A protein has these predicted regions:
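Residue(s) in the substrate-gating loop at a strand-loop-helix junction
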Residues: 1-257, 263
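Catalytic core segments in nucleotide and nucleic-acid processing enzymes
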Residues: 1-31, 257-417
Length: 417
């Protein structure tokens, strides 16, 4: 049985070659993957890898690397279980991940990786589709038939059937299950079968393939997914297709002629934090007269647009929230961030804006007015909020975080000069 190895690291940490089963072949594979993605995932050193703000999971052959988020600069090793749970819950809430009961149990036992959860999600969706009954579609098929139907491919017919007068080489329509949707799902099943060897999911995957129709092997690309038909008949397939897309487009077999099979499911933690806060604020504002918008944009210069992370609209008044996934400690916000908030206030006619950072403890000390060039008394202002992402137990995510942020924004101003 193939032995699977697992490494857990934090974002912005350094993983040295030779450390914790991370070998030169893994380093080379990661460097090639990084080049394919415009060097955005890692910084490469001569002796290892420095991870950036991307979190998630990588698998190179039998080595799985989980990249976990963190707030503090130096996060203890023993907190990795807590931060894995944070990442899973954030992905779940933002609908990038779904955990089934078996997966939930395994997560609690720390016997499962993030990649296993994605694989299990996909297999459960395909199993459900098989149980409901896989759809048939019309599709074109080219080959030899014994009765003339469809379009005769004359040149190939002469070439192949000169000695077989009873055959016809045609392109014709077939009504069956070997269509593009099932071919895409079949490719994802093959990838999971390959990468799950030695894990508890491998047997489940092999069993599922026995119930899945035999379909033509394809190598799906980004354009393949744009060709998939959409209809009410196909609606039950949407989740399975979206997971298949994530798996297929992030799978790199024999990357740049190497021998390692690799899959990378990585998420920008800045964007994930933004989406997470947006959802929590929407949840908190359901019973209030507050409209919440994400990535509302306005033209800034020529074709350049600006878009704050979150815009709140209440009684025709707008408020701005911009999220930053970084711990600034006791430091002031950067000049760049303050300029950004000033421009947002000006363009959205907002009286106040909030820079929002994650923290271990809540800290909000009101708003400070921007200095007015024309001595305007009611100049707009900006606040700095550090919000605890955990409940008091410091292990579970605070599901009331949205209410806390709304309270900072909507209550009477506490203004400092």
């Amino acid at each position: 049985m193939i032995s699977h190895k697992r490494i857990q690291v934090y974002e912005h940490s350094f993983l040295r070659i030779g450390e914790r089963d991370f070998d030169t072949k893994h380093f080379i594979a990661l460097s090639k993957l990084n080049a394919l993605h415009n060097y955005q995932y890692f910084d490469l050193k001569h002796n290892g890898v420095v991870f950036k703000q991307f979190v998630g999971v990588l698998q190179v052959d039998n080595l799985t690397i989980e990249i976990l988020p963190k707030i503090d600069r130096y996060e203890p090793e023993e907190n990795k279980k807590k931060w894995q749970s944070v990442l899973i819950e954030m992905l779940h809430l933002t609908k990038k991940l779904k955990i089934h009961e078996a997966g939930q149990t395994n997560v609690a036992r720390q016997s499962i990786t993030l990649l296993d959860i994605y694989f299990e999600w996909f297999l459960s969706e395909v199993q459900l589709l098989i149980h409901q009954g896989l759809i048939k579609q019309y599709y074109k098929q080219t080959g030899n038939v014994k009765a003339l139907k469809g379009k005769l491919e004359f040149a190939i017919h002469i070439q192949k059937n000169l000695a077989h007068k009873e055959r016809f080489y045609t392109t014709h329509q077939v009504y069956g299950k070997d269509h593009l949707i099932h071919q895409v799902l079949g490719q994802a099943l093959d990838i999971i079968t390959n990468l799950s060897k030695g894990s508890y999911l491998h047997a489940k995957c092999k069993t599922l393939k026995l119930d899945f129709p035999e379909v033509k092997s394809i190598n799906a690309t980004e354009s393949t997914f744009t060709k998939l038909p959409r209809s009410r008949k196909n609606a039950p397939y949407e989740t399975a297709i979206s997971i298949a897309r994530l798996i297929i487009l992030n799978y790199a077999p024999n990357i740049s002629k190497g021998t390692e099979k690799m899959l990378a499911l990585l998420f920008d933690m800045n964007k994930l934090w933004e989406e997470y806060i947006l959802i929590r604020i929407k949840q908190a504002s359901k019973d209030n007269n507050i409209q919440v918008y994400g990535q509302n944009s306005k033209t800034f210069w020529r074709n350049v647009s600006i878009h704050p992370d979150i815009v709140l609209l209440c009684d025709k008044e707008q408020f701005i929230i911009d999220t930053k996934w970084k711990n600034i400690g006791n430091n002031k916000p950067s000049i760049h961030d303050l300029r950004q908030m000033y421009v947002y206030n000006e363009y959205w006619k907002s009286s106040k804006s909030l820079l929002l950072y994650p923290s271990s403890n809540d800290d909000f000390d009101g708003y400070i007015r921007f200095v007015s060039l024309d001595n305007t008394a009611d100049q707009h202002k900006c606040g700095l909020g550090k919000v605890s992402i955990f409940k008091d137990c410091n292990t579970l995510l605070n599901d009331q975080i949205g209410s806390k942020i709304l309270n900072w924004i909507m209550n009477e101003d506490k203004i400092r000069v």
